[in-house]
A protein has these predicted regions:
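Cleavable N-terminal signal peptides of Sec/SRP-targeted secreted and luminal proteins
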Residues: 1-15
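Solvent-exposed loop/turn segments at secondary-structure junctions
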Residues: 66-70, 113-116, 127, 139, ...
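Catalytic centers of hydrolytic enzymes
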Residues: 18, 23-99, 134, 191, ...
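Short acidic, glycine/serine/threonine-rich loops at helix termini
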Residues: 73-75, 117-122, 151-154, 176-182, ...
Length: 633
């Protein structure tokens, strides 16, 4: 009797909850749908005045990790069509700020320009350099993925560019020089701005120091960099900043870097920093990572040497401060940007006033935003998001639309890119975006490794989730998304490996710095401790039952050519294992996925997202705050 009453109560509670949710969604739909068709203003806060009576504000428009994405990503669901990104819209923001501040602004980029977007691949990166030229980029530093290409490729991009590569911590041992790109590379750069203050002409100079990531030395796949060294950050930054401030008398020093920084990850592993605002130092925000290279650098160097940071690499929204130093960074693929405003005192010798510095962002880059969130992206797991209309919008009173200065780029490249717009299949079974990494889940990796097993007949398939460079959304899947997700051009390979080596290999993979590797055909148990993660067991798993791996039995494994040639943690595996019956003639990874999905026409992803049957199970034995990671069959 008690059980029946309990069940009835649960049913009634859920019924009321369902009815309440529908009332709320009906109200919101009615509220927003009754709005006029006029574009909404998204910058609803106190803005920086270019004619401020106390300060001269110089805006620094910051981007990073564009990863070859010139065109917007377009998503089509049954009742919802939206897009995200598109450098036409980015340029509109830049030109709005440029006009407001009478061309006295800096546009800087934190690197990782080319590797990723199909449009960059099929144009050899030229479309991205053309964009930066048209948008009047003032300088960029190099990301780790710039070293995926041969030096000759990068030399050609440098020749095409109307802006310098600002990098101070590279060293060419052969030429005994810090310049590896000749006159197109500078160690530091100084930008000068002239103003009239009290009928007197004054000048403000901003010095920029560029840094690229030291760890790149272990990830270079392009040729021609054998003699290149990556130097330590601290000594170079201190020396260059002192030179800029003491000898060249700049008013402020900005660090332009690609060395990684993140703030505000919630316990779910989600970046929570997407609220557009005008931020100041004392605003309450989520804490920043204390173990990041940027944090360590800013804490280690002498106070007063750096005044601001524009950085990249971590694909996170950052509009935060370390000490008195404002830092901006953004997510990948040109989906957002930030503006950092440096304040110089008109009444005190144009000295920088850290307390008056501001950060405006993150700016949504897209054709239309969701009314109610002011974001371009579909907010997964939200019952209300599909009912929020997608509307035109304004920034600082100006409608965001395609900037006409980009027309020549479209005339040059659109026809080639449009060949990849066909829909190849439909993703069903979820309303969530399928991310390469999300709250410890690797849904895309589960799908891709399963495709590799089915295509090659392998028993086990392995991929690094960091080799997956974009996300899928439910609904129609266009051809170009396949090549955005797997842009590196690696071949799919198979090889035989004995069971004892399989177990040893997985222990290396799942305890290394690039863990966790996504795998199909096995089930794993990982222990998390204060000293790190380690694999407790790995067994064959066909989706229904587990079997022990026999030490002497050989198993057919599939992985990409980058890994089997010693990329990432596989360099350690190749110390004890020599690939047997290696075959790499299946074609490129992206081509394999494209062929497979085109034949399927639809793919139901529910089995890859079923948390009742995880293929990696974690036992947490750490006292530290960790993000619990799950993988699903």
């Amino acid at each position: 009797m008690f059980v029946n009453l309990f069940l009835i109560n649960i049913i009634l509670i859920n019924a009321y909850k369902f009815q309440f949710e529908h009332l709320i969604t009906d109200y919101i739909k009615s509220f927003y749908n009754n709005k006029s068709d006029e574009p909404i203003e998204i910058a609803n806060y106190d803005r920086i005045n270019s004619d401020d009576p106390n300060y001269i504000y110089i805006p620094i428009f910051g981007t990073s990790d564009i990863h070859g994405h010139f065109y917007p990503d377009k998503f089509k669901l049954e009742q919802l069509n939206y897009s995200q990104g598109g450098l036409d819209y980015m340029t509109k923001y830049i030109n709005i700020i440029r006009e407001e501040f009478d061309n006295k602004m800096l546009y800087l980029d934190g690197g990782d320009l080319f590797q990723g977007g199909l449009e960059s691949t099929i144009t050899n990166g030229s479309i991205i350099v053309d964009y930066f030229n048209y948008a009047k980029l003032k300088g960029l530093t190099l990301g780790n993925h710039e070293f995926d290409y041969d030096k000759q490729y990068m030399d050609e991009k440098a020749d095409q560019a109307n802006f310098p590569f600002i990098v101070s911590n590279l060293y060419d041992k052969a030429n005994k020089s810090r310049k590896i790109y000749g006159d197109k590379q500078v160690i530091t750069e100084i930008y000068s701005f002239k103003y009239n203050v009290n009928n007197e002409e004054v000048e403000i100079k901003i010095g920029v120091i560029g840094l690229t990531m030291i760890l790149t030395k272990n990830q270079i796949t392009g040729g021609g960099f054998d003699n290149i060294e990556f130097k330590d950050y601290k000594s170079i930054v201190e020396a260059e900043a002192k030179e800029l401030k003491n000898s060249k008398k700049v008013n402020a020093v900005v660090l332009l870097s690609h060395i990684g920084f993140w703030c505000g990850y919630s316990g779910t592993g989600q970046d929570v920093n997407f609220t557009l605002n005008m931020y100041k130092k004392d605003d309450k925000q989520e804490p920043c990572a204390q173990d990041s290279n940027i944090t360590k650098l800013l804490n280690d160097i002498e106070d007063g040497l750096l005044d601001a940071v524009v950085t990249g690499h971590s694909h996170c929204e950052v509009h935060h401060w370390i000490k008195d130093i404002p830092i901006i960074s953004t997510v990948n693929n040109g989906a957002y940007a930030n503006i950092l405003y440096l304040a110089f005192d008109k009444k005190n010798k144009l000295k920088l006033v850290p307390s008056a510095n501001r950060i405006e962002g993150p700016l949504p880059i897209c054709e239309k935003v969701f009314n109610g969130t002011h974001r371009c992206d579909f907010i997964e797991n939200s019952k209300l998001a599909p009912f929020l209309p997608i509307v035109n919008y304004k920034f600082h009173g100006v409608i965001i639309e395609k900037d006409e200065s980009m027309n020549k780029i479209h005339e040059k490249y659109d026809e080639l890119y449009n060949e990849y717009q066909e829909t190849i299949c439909k993703i069903i079974g979820t309303n969530e975006e399928l991310k390469r990494y999300d709250n410890g889940s690797f849904y895309l990796g589960n799908i891709i490794t399963d495709i590799y097993n089915k295509y090659t007949g392998s028993q086990i398939s392995i991929i690094s989730y960091k080799g997956i460079r974009s996300n899928w959304s439910p609904g129609d899947l266009p051809k170009y998304k396949i090549y955005d997700i797997l842009p590196f051009g690696n071949n799919l390979c198979t090889f035989l490996m004995r069971g004892e080596h399989v177990k040893k290999a997985f222990k290396i993979l799942q305890s290394g710095p690039r863990r966790f590797y996504v795998a199909s055909g096995v089930k794993q148990l990982v222990i998390r401790t204060d000293d790190g993660d380690y694999l407790s067991s790995v067994k064959l798993f066909d989706g229904y039952e587990e079997k022990d791996l026999e030490d002497e039995e050989e198993y057919l494994i599939s992985a990409n050519s980058f890994l089997i040639n010693g990329g990432d943690e596989f360099q350690k595996i190749l110390r004890f294992y020599k690939p047997k019956n290696l075959r790499c003639d299946y074609g490129k990874e992206a081509d394999v996925v494209f062929k497979f999905l085109k034949e399927q026409k639809t793919i139901d992803v529910r089995k890859y997202m079923d948390d009742k049957n995880p293929v990696i199970r974690f036992i947490n034995k750490t006292n530290k705050r960790v993000i619990h990671t799950k993988l699903y069959k």
